[in-house]
Regions:
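Short glycine/proline- and aromatic-enriched beta-strand/turn motifs that initiate or cap beta-hairpins
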Residues: 34-85
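Outer membrane beta-barrel transmembrane domains
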Residues: 186-222
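Detector for outer-membrane/organellar transmembrane beta-barrel domains
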Residues: 74, 125-198
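Outer-membrane beta-barrel "beta-signal"
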Residues: 214, 218-220, 240-253
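Cleavable N-terminal export/targeting peptides
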Residues: 1-40, 253
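Outer-membrane beta-barrel pore domains and translocons
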Residues: 46-50, 80-84, 99, 109-113, ...
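Residues that define the transmembrane beta-barrel architecture of outer-membrane proteins
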Residues: 39, 60-64, 71, 88-92, ...
Length: 253
């Protein structure tokens, strides 16, 4: 019985991956009217001095984040990756999100971390017992009329296992505030915490603050061209760590 349910969950994870790929492949063959309005496709890339996510450090060097995106109305699908320039971290992600009434965004993401030697990886190993994937469901409340957001996310399937080998359901909550200046620069402050014994605290501690972030977003201006940049100070009280990162952004959108 357990094997049957495990196979069903693995099949569900595979369907998510194939569904995202199919969307990205088939959508261009839509109506001519939509094509005349401009392509819903765009490519984006971020170059960051260090990969820090939710108070956790990934890799030891500057990291490149390329992404292929499809956006139509409130729907967004993305194929993205993360590659540290010294090879200390690799990541391949699939994501879907849908925003309801410019207020609530529901998301489903698949995170996969290839090893340093790619030939040893098995992307389609989807069994619950030994898969390298992590599937996360999330909900973000961010009304356009309020300069704040509240995010709740949970790892619902995959390699997120506790010390007993059971699914840990690592859960993260984040409350943030953003101030927009008259010149469109943005200053954000976020407070994030894990809500259970998950990977944010190495499956050893329950609720803890793991991410305090102060971020400033602006542009470098070259004649009429503006290059988006950001600087972030990140503090992880649980791990007694702090980081400062700088990022530049490129997009065809």
């Amino acid at each position: 019985m357990n094997n049957m349910f495990g196979n069903m969950r693995a099949y569900g994870s595979l369907k998510l991956s194939l569904f995202i790929v199919c969307i990205l492949c088939l959508k261009p063959f839509g109506s001519r009217a939509q094509a005349n309005e401009g392509s819903p496709w765009y490519v984006s890339c971020e170059l960051s001095s260090k990969y820090v996510w939710r108070g956790l450090e990934y890799g030891k060097s500057p990291t490149l984040f390329p992404s292929i995106n499809y956006e139509s109305g409130s729907f967004l699908a993305a194929l993205s990756g993360a590659y540290a320039v010294d090879g200390s971290h690799q990541e391949v992600d699939l994501g879907l999100s849908y925003t309801i009434k410019d207020m609530v965004t529901l998301g489903l993401n698949d995170y996969f971390f290839p090893s340093a030697v790619g030939q040893n990886d098995s992307y389609f190993r989807l069994r619950h017992s030994d898969t390298g994937h992590n599937v996360e469901a999330s909900a973000t409340f961010a009304p356009t009329k309020l300069p704040m957001w509240l995010k709740l996310s949970c790892y619902v399937y995959g390699a997120d296992k506790d010390s007993t080998g059971k699914q840990a359901y690592s859960t993260y909550a984040e409350l943030g505030y953003q101030y927009v200046f008259k010149n469109e620069d943005k200053l954000s402050l976020a407070l994030g915490a894990n809500l259970n014994k998950g990977f944010y605290t190495d499956y050893e501690r329950g609720a803890n603050v793991v991410n305090i972030m102060l971020k400033y977003e602006s542009w470098f201006t070259f004649n009429k061209f503006r290059l988006p940049v950001s600087a972030s100070y990140v503090l992880n009280p649980y791990r007694n760590k702090s980081y400062f990162t700088f990022s530049v952004y490129f997009s065809t959108k």
